[in-house]
């Protein structure tokens, strides 16, 4: 009975438990250096053994009580983050939770051979949908793996070699496996763009049953899907050093930038902007801003190298002739990052300080148009007269990240000021205080907003080293994740509404797989936040 009381006491006093564990190991060391004649004395030996057995029982039992919350039992409760005073401990818990959420999601959303991802799973009915995930949704699993790998590397830097050694290789292998099976979304087609006609192999929206055989013509591939994949390929390269990731990232980058509208207006300026896809004319925030950060990263990769690249453009004099030019990769990538950033800021930043969805109101219509120049067919510019659509959190999040990365690369104060203003405006616009839970901020969770919000968190994290206010903004995500984990974890999964919980009607608890991978990625991103709080 006394032991049970001690265990319960220790369960809610983790700091004391840690001290006892330390004392236990000190005692073990003491026993090892105890004089041999004393250790071999029968009575002394029995007395020491009794002391250590009792102490060992208390330590093991208390540690067990602290580990129990990590199971999948529905009644699971975890000690609140507020009880953990050491920021490194918070970060380790974040990473462990991320890995638990990710591993569980792989179990329920992927086929047994891990080749296919399904879209929905209901933890109450235990039913998985037959509908397979789109490539965008599938990419969320790769994003989560990369975030976990980044967290593991951060833990190693902090001295937690054991956590790194036990998990790093497994997630590196998972990254390679997920990347390999993404080929079920790959397909090839011939595209006439603003400057050329060329064959490309890119990612389709939907998965097919054979690698490399997807239909990617027209609207069946979109540029933003390639951008999310590019981002994760470069991140994978930076984390593992695997050259194949970088090679594919640059290939897809060439495809995406081939979609840039380099036709010129009456003043000789580029019309600019990348349409949603080769089958669309509207130019979306999601098909432009996500490319800014990856381009800065490519610039940084090649900054000290002399690698060259040849690109195509439209002559500024006659405004029709297609030309080509060869320059250093580092210069090319940084210049394009600036151009995309400037286009989106000029056309889509609204009077609320956040970003609209897209440039629309096509004139004369929204059909892809072509023109003939010197006997050769090229894509033609379509006028877009107005910024329209909902302001989604990710369209501001990508621009915060882009501003932070461009500031790091250029040290131009304009990017820092842009990033600070957009960070403040985004938090004010997207985070609603006390609307569900006191002292918590609610972010929209309908539609695909859970994933969108993770992109906003990434922006807060990326700018926080140079804009300290972002630290309090990102903490709102930590609070919401912890609240959902403490109150609503069910069968190892979190609900779509972290603060509101599950539907009373269990049949309505069909959860998007990409949301679970988004939660895992968010926890992992918070785990290697070097600012600690």
Where do the protein language model's features map onto the residues?
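Short hydrophobic targeting helices and cationic amphipathic motifs
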Residues: 10, 16, 25-26, 31, ...
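Extended ligand-binding groove/face enriched in aromatic
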Residues: 162-318, 334-335, 372-373
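Active-site cradle of extracellular carbohydrate-active enzymes
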Residues: 271, 278, 286-295, 324-403
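CBM-like carbohydrate-recognition segments
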Residues: 79-224, 283, 391, 414-533
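Bacterial N-terminal signal peptides
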Residues: 58-68
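Bacterial N-terminal signal peptides that target proteins for export
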Residues: 47-59
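Short coil/turn linking the two alpha-helices of tandem helical-hairpin repeats
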Residues: 149, 153, 237-241, 299-306, ...
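Boundary at the C-terminal end of the N-terminal hydrophobic targeting segment
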Residues: 73-75
């Amino acid at each position: 009975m006394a032991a049970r009381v001690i265990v319960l006491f220790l369960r809610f006093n983790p700091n004391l438990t840690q001290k006892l564990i330390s004392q236990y190991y000190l005692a073990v060391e003491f026993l090892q250096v105890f004089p041999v004649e004393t250790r071999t004395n029968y009575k002394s030996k029995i007395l020491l053994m009794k002391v250590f057995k009792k102490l060992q029982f208390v330590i093991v039992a208390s540690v067990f009580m602290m580990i129990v919350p990590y199971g999948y039992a529905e009644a699971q409760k975890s000690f609140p983050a507020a009880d953990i005073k050491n920021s490194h401990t918070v970060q380790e818990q974040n990473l462990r939770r991320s890995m638990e959420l990710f591993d569980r999601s792989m179990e329920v959303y992927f086929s047994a051979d891990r080749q296919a991802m399904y879209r929905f799973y209901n933890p109450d009915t235990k039913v998985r949908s037959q509908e397979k995930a789109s490539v965008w949704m599938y990419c969320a699993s790769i994003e989560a793996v990369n975030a976990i790998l980044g967290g593991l590397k951060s833990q190693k830097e902090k001295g937690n070699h054991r956590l790194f050694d036990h998990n790093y290789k497994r997630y590196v292998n998972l990254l390679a496996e997920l990347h390999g099976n993404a080929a079920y979304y790959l397909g090839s087609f011939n595209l006439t763009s603003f400057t050329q006609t060329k064959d490309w192999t890119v990612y389709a929206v939907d998965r097919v049953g054979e690698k490399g055989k997807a239909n990617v013509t027209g609207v069946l591939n979109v540029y933003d899907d390639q951008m999310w994949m590019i981002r994760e390929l470069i991140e994978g390269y930076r984390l593992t050093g695997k050259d194949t990731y970088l090679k594919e990232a640059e290939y897809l980058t060439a495809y995406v930038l081939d979609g840039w509208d380099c036709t010129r207006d009456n003043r000789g300026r580029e019309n600019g902007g990348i349409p949603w896809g080769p089958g669309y004319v509207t130019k979306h925030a999601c098909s432009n801003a996500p490319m800014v950060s990856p381009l800065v990263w490519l610039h940084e990769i090649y900054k000290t190298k002399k690698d060259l690249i040849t690109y195509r453009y439209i002559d500024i004099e006659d405004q029709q002739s297609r030309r080509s030019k060869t320059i250093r990769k580092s210069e090319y990538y940084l210049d394009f990052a600036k151009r995309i950033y400037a286009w989106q800021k000029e056309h889509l930043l609204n009077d609320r300080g956040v970003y609209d969805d897209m440039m629309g109101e096509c004139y004369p219509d929204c059909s892809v148009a072509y023109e003939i120049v010197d006997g050769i067919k090229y894509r033609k510019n379509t006028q877009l007269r107005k910024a329209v659509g909902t302001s989604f959190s990710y369209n501001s999040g990508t621009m915060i990240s882009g501003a932070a990365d461009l500031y790091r690369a250029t040290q131009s104060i304009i990017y820092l000021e842009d990033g600070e203003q957009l960070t403040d405006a985004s938090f004010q616009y997207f985070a609603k205080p006390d609307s569900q839970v006191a002292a918590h901020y609610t972010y929209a969770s309908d539609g695909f907003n859970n994933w969108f919000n993770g992109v906003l968190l990434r922006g807060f994290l990326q700018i926080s080293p140079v804009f300290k206010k972002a630290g309090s903004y990102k903490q709102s995500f930590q609070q919401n994740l912890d609240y959902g984990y403490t109150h609503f974890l069910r069968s190892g999964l979190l609900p779509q509404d972290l603060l509101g919980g599950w539907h009373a009607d269990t049949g309505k608890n069909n959860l998007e797989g990409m949301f679970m991978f988004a939660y895992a990625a968010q926890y992992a991103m918070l785990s290697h936040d070097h600012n600690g709080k």
